[in-house]
Amino acid sequence: MLYIFRLIITVIYSILVCVFGSIYCLFSPRNPKHVATFGHMFGRLAPLFGLKVECRKPTDAESYGNAIYIANHQNNYDMVTASNIVQPPTVTVGKKSLLWIPFFGQLYWLTGNLLIDRNNRTKAHGTIAEVVNHFKKRRISIWMFPEGTRSRGRGLLPFKTGAFHAAIAAGVPIIPVCVSTTSNKINLNRLHNGLVIVEMLPPIDVSQYGKDQVRELAAHCRSIMEQKIAELDKEVAEREAAGKV
């Protein structure tokens, strides 16, 4: 019964956000500031799922300039966990098929997110060039999931190199965002589903990396994130066991 209640409320809330959000965005379409606004609105669903989301970020995070944010991509619950920490003006890079999701697809495009055709390598590389051009024209940051797909309980997957090519080409730092494990954690028929920690790490300077060191940079970032996620998972387990959620 709790599952059905949560599902109904989530669907109604999401449709309302997408419909009225799309109308709102028509007055300033493709404005990158909208992404954080509506990302935070979806983040408000966390308590409905019985989750306490704790966000941590450096004290000067709101003053960061252009950057590429990279985050671990676990499942659909990323929409109510990682979305809470998105900083304006940040847009995401998502697959083109997202456009076909009723209501959400239209909002996703209107808020200024970038779409990539993963089935066409030429167009995919073109998107990286587009990202670099965006950095040159205005103050904007890009949010990417370097794993390229949801991990679904398989741990941190190998990183694809697109985000790191773009960072080196544009000369902007990479900012890792780590989310504690949510796979196999959430039971929608259970009232309380515990703690999730979302932590933004300090920027990683890419100026010391050349175009031929993309994989080295990717491996370095993945190592940092893997270690931090393990630390967060340990903290979550200890706090939940002690009832200090």
Swiss-Prot record:
It catalyses: a 1-acyl-sn-glycero-3-phosphate + an acyl-CoA = a 1,2-diacyl-sn-glycero-3-phosphate + CoA; a fatty acyl-[ACP] + a 1-acyl-sn-glycero-3-phosphate = a 1,2-diacyl-sn-glycero-3-phosphate + holo-[ACP]. Keywords: Acyltransferase, Cell inner membrane, Cell membrane, Formylation, Lipid biosynthesis, Lipid metabolism, Membrane, Phospholipid biosynthesis, Phospholipid metabolism, Transferase. It comes from Escherichia coli (strain K12). The lineage of its organism: Bacteria, Pseudomonadati, Pseudomonadota, Gammaproteobacteria, Enterobacterales. It comes from the Bacteria. SUPFAM superfamilies: Glycerol-3-phosphate (1)-acyltransferase (SSF69593). CDD domains: LPLAT_AGPAT-like. Belongs to the 1-acyl-sn-glycerol-3-phosphate acyltransferase family. A motif (HXXXXD motif) lies at residues 73-78. This is 1-acyl-sn-glycerol-3-phosphate acyltransferase.
